[in-house]
Amino acid sequence: MTVNLDWENLGFSYMKLPYRYIAYYRNGQWEEGTLTEDATLHISESSPSLHYGQQAFEGLKAYRTKDGSIQLFRPDKNAERLQRTADRLLMPQVPTEMFVDAVKQVVRANEEYVPPYGTGGTLYIRPLLIGVGDIIGVKPAEEYIFTIFVMPVGNYFKGGLTPTNFIVSDDYDRAAPHGTGAAKVGGNYAASLLPGKIAKDKHFSDVIYLDPATHTKIEEVGSANFFGITKNDEFVTPLSPSILPSITKYSLLYLAEHRLGLKPIEGDVPLADLGKFTEAGACGTAAVISPIGGIQHGDDFHVFYSETEVGPVTRKLYDELTGIQFGDVEAPEGWIVKV
């Protein structure tokens, strides 16, 4: 079957594809999952996921390589992160083998929608874990649904990798010091909508959140992780229990050290130390790397490498990681899973 899509101009939006995966957790165990054409979830109106936010999700991609094969990038790490989130919300873990197999099933079932090599497009994969059933009152569900749907998405940067500017939020926190910041739960994203809108209304790309305890250290950039490059060839990124551990960030930390010869550093990133960075960026699944041109904080605006050009180290990191994902660059052992 040939799919007639404008592959070069795909955006990042929902598209209903023929198949998705669904599995039910009942009576203390996971039942065998299945592929279905039904894109609607049928759940009780009193499901804890609707009322109390007992839900978790993931995001990853499938890539078409030059030889036409399809591969995944570190799906086991997404499985492990979903397991940690499930533990935090008293939900049953989805075993890694079950997770990866389910991802493979749904990608294979919709493989004609994986964008061709060279278009920059990918098949975005959204696993979702929700508590369901007739529960009223604040307590964990007894039944759960694990589902995965997919859609083709385009290159995040249509005109090529481009820096954008961000603004520091002094009025809003992304997460509480001992809250759910390290978990990938919907509530964290719902809370980011208002500050994100305020930033965009001021013509910034998104918000930079500070640590919730002291408001002096950089934590996250919108829904992505922050990194900075110093003149001393250091790759620096924040470390905090309220930051979502990005698979992209940890991949970049490894590549920065082992492919580019940089010194990887995880630790506090004081806002007052922005001047030590010659380049900066945000990283995550959607864009891979979003170069940061400048950061506004109060009346101060700090420019890194350039507001219009991507720094050389950021460019090398982006090319190295995307090269691995699309099969053009040799991957570290265990990073690539063929579908």
Task: Annotate the PLM regions.
Residues 1-106, 128, 135-339:
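Helix-start/capping segments and mature chain N-termini
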Residues 96, 106-118:
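Charged, gly/pro-rich active-site loop segments
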Residues 113-120, 330-334:
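Short glycine-rich, low-complexity/disordered patches
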Residues 116-130:
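Extended, Lys/Arg-enriched charged tracts that mediate electrostatic binding to polyanionic substrates
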